[in-house]
Design a protein with these regions (language model features):
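Metal-dependent polysaccharide deacetylase catalytic core of the NodB/CE4 family, i.e.
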Residues: 1-6, 10, 50-52, 59-66, ...
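C-terminal active-site subregion of NodB/CE4 polysaccharide deacetylases
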Residues: 1-38, 53-60, 64-68, 79-80, ...
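Proline- and acidic/polar-enriched loop/turn elements at helix boundaries
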Residues: 42, 203, 272-273
Length: 328
């Protein structure tokens, strides 16, 4: 496969990605087991007094709610040629699909990533989506969003513009930032109408546990200026690297939290790999996430056993052993 072609990116894809075949099998198994997609706003919401309040989810007996989320839905330059879609588009029927560039340079439109795959599945199985609610799409901004080059840096071309962006701009001399942003907003609007929610994954994929306050503030403003207008704003932050701003205790008094809260963020999600972790105060709703990827399936199938049997879904095209993290 193109993702597992032995280049320097192969190990990373093997560790932190899920193949289409795996994803489709997982979706079918979880549906068959009675899982139903809900969103964060189904679980808790800010009341008229500005306080976070728990809500009730009503499902038929035998059904289990879960939240689906996908990070980095930006179609980075670094992924070109690796068997990954290039952008999300709207087809002639008004459905959200992917554009994919084939080896000969021609483009095809189809369902090659989480959003259109779930959309097609829910068309056939509407009871998989509670009130039509689907997953959360977490966005960075440094290469733009949803495959559109929406960041201001593509227009201003600062001195520190990286080689990926320079090469893309050289190949697209007719680039127009306003057109890219308008197209991205059109797709984002269509996704929201289909039940998708957007979250910040930080503009620059920053590790929020280690980043300085100054960098955090700059990054947050970059997100607000470049992405919020396209997605209608968001009050959810899904931490890049899964790295939280503290080690599990309440956020109250945490300088980074106080700043993010002041910027309108009410929902915070890390990656802790537990079956579930929820923490709620008047000020925020916090939830852990589980990574369903090559690393977790290969090394810790037991940590996913309540969702699906890894032996039924693990893609034989994956090189094994899956490389350990940090080369360890």
């Amino acid at each position: 496969s193109k993702a597992f072609d032995g280049d320097y990116k192969t190990d990373g894809y093997n560790q932190v990605m899920t193949t289409m075949d795996e994803f489709n099998k997982i979706t079918q198994i979880m549906y068959d087991e009675g899982y139903v997609m809900v969103n964060l706003y189904d679980l808790a919401d800010i009341d008229e007094n500005g306080k976070m309040q728990a809500k009730q989810v009503y499902l038929p007996k035998g059904k289990t709610p879960f939240i689906l989320s996908q990070d980095d839905v930006c179609y980075y330059h670094s992924q070109d040629g690796d068997g990954i879609a290039t952008k999300l588009v709207i087809d002639e029927e008004g459905k959200v699909r992917n554009e994919y560039v084939q080896d000969d340079g021609s483009t095809v439109v189809g369902d090659y990533d989480v959003v259109p795959l779930i959309d097609r599945f829910v068309e056939e199985h509407p009871d998989f989506a509670y009130h039509g609610h689907k997953g959360i799409v977490a966005l960075t901004g440094y290469n733009g969003i949803l495959g559109y080059r929406t960041d201001i840096s593509y227009q201003t071309r600062p001195d520190d513009l990286n080689d990926d962006k320079k090469a893309w701009l050289d190949a697209h001399p007719d680039f127009d930032l306003d057109i890219e942003r308008a197209e991205a907003k059109k797709v984002a609007d269509a996704m929201k109408a289909e039940g998708w929610t957007f979250a910040s994954h930080t503009w620059g994929h920053k590790n929020m546990s280690t980043v300085s306050m100054e960098r955090l503030e700059t990054d947050t403003q970059n997100f607000k200026e470049n992405i919020d207008p396209l997605i209608g704003g968001t009050d959810i932050i899904i931490f890049a690297f899964g790295a939280d701003i503290n080690n599990g205790g309440e956020y109250t008094g945490n300088e980074k939290f106080e700043y993010l809260k002041s910027q309108g963020y009410d929902y915070y999600c890390n990656v802790d790999s537990n079956q579930y972790f929820v923490q709620m105060t008047d000020e925020y709703f916090r939830m852990g996430r589980r990574n369903v990827d090559g690393y977790r399936m290969y090394y810790n199938p037991d940590m996913l056993a309540d969702l699906f049997d890894v032996s039924q879904v693990f893609d034989p095209s994956r090189p094994t052993p899956v490389p350990p993290m940090n080369g360890g």
